[in-house]
Amino acid sequence: MAVDITLLFRASVKTVKTRNKALGVAVGGGVDGSRDELFRRSPRPKGDFSSRAREVISHIGKLRDFLLEHRKDYINAYSHTMSEYGRMTDTERDQIDQDAQIFMRTCSEAIQQLRTEAHKEIHSQQVKEHRTAVLDFIEDYLKRVCKLYSEQRAIRVKRVVDKKRLSKLEPEPNTKTRESTSSEKVSRSPSKDSEENPATEERPEKILAETQPELGTWGDGKGEDELSPEEIQMFEQENQRLIGEMNSLFDEVRQIEGRVVEISRLQEIFTEKVLQQEAEIDSIHQLVVGATENIKEGNEDIREAIKNNAGFRVWILFFLVMCSFSLLFLDWYDS
């Protein structure tokens, strides 16, 4: 049984805060001002990324704890008939499947969003590597929780198939109903006789005439318990047919079990490939953004080169015109 340790946790947090505050005062009382400023600025890297990453890890951990807590009731197809505690209906199991899939999809989108923002922000190489490692760890944690959910779902589907197979193999209740109706008739006859006692006193001969055929049929029924050879052969053929049907059902169940296991394995592979494709799409997006920025810079350089080339042409034309005028002036002066 879980124990509430909230008060102990709060006391521990308060003790740690007091100790850190005391250490901060001791460091701040030093002579070196630059050292004091360094210690003051040290908590600055704790930003939005760390809090959001911790939040995603907390959500994934809650999902894992929830799946493990309700594992027995979730995978047990007979929990609603075995005990009143831990009862879970198929509707609740379907709701758990739907909520878990939505939750895992949301966590995956949050991880990809954190990865995109980490690539966009300008940080040192060490910070980028640290954030990439943190996101890889969170993604691996999510994959393990997805694998746990896939295994539980495969076990549940397998047990549901077994339950349906067993329900198909239950005997038909025709003989039981016939026996119950005959016993009810026999039990009701004394009560009717007791209720209709005044009428029977008036007509005893008629009642005896009615009861004698009933006793005769009862004795005939006892004699009919012995089966003839034709009936025995017919029942043996029916038994052989039922055995063949059960064997075919067992074979079908084994095939379905193999297919369910294969589907769960393919689902795990599909989930892993989808996460890999999301990471590749994100990296392609980053490359496209970088290529777009490079194209913009190249266009700016081309514009600057065109402007510089135009100015250079103007100076060349000016030089040629001045040279022409100088030659004309010298020719006129010489003549």
UniProtKB/Swiss-Prot annotation:
Residues 1-309 are cytoplasmic. It is found in: Endoplasmic reticulum membrane; Golgi apparatus membrane. Its main location: endoplasmic reticulum. Gene3D superfamilies: 1.20.5.110. Disulfide bonds: none annotated. InterPro entries: Syntaxin-18_N, Syntaxin/epimorphin_CS. GO terms for biological process: intracellular protein transport; retrograde vesicle-mediated transport, Golgi to endoplasmic reticulum. This is Syntaxin-18. The keyword Transmembrane helix applies. Keywords: Coiled coil, Endoplasmic reticulum, ER-Golgi transport, Golgi apparatus, Membrane, Protein transport, Transmembrane, Transmembrane helix, Transport. Residues 331-335 are vesicular. Residues 168-208 have a biased composition (Basic and acidic residues). The keyword Protein transport applies. GO terms for molecular function: SNAP receptor activity. It comes from the Eukaryota. Syntaxin that may be involved in targeting and fusion of Golgi-derived retrograde transport vesicles with the ER. The chain crosses the membrane at residues 310-330. Belongs to the syntaxin family. CDD domains: SNARE_syntaxin18. Residues 243-305 form the t-SNARE coiled-coil homology domain. Component of a SNARE complex consisting of STX18, USE1L, BNIP1/SEC20L, and SEC22B. RINT1/TIP20L and ZW10 are associated with the complex through interaction with BNIP1/SEC20L. Interacts directly with USE1L and BNIP1/SEC20L. It is a single-pass type IV membrane protein. Residues 168-226 are annotated as: Disordered. GO terms for cellular component: endoplasmic reticulum membrane; Golgi membrane; SNARE complex.
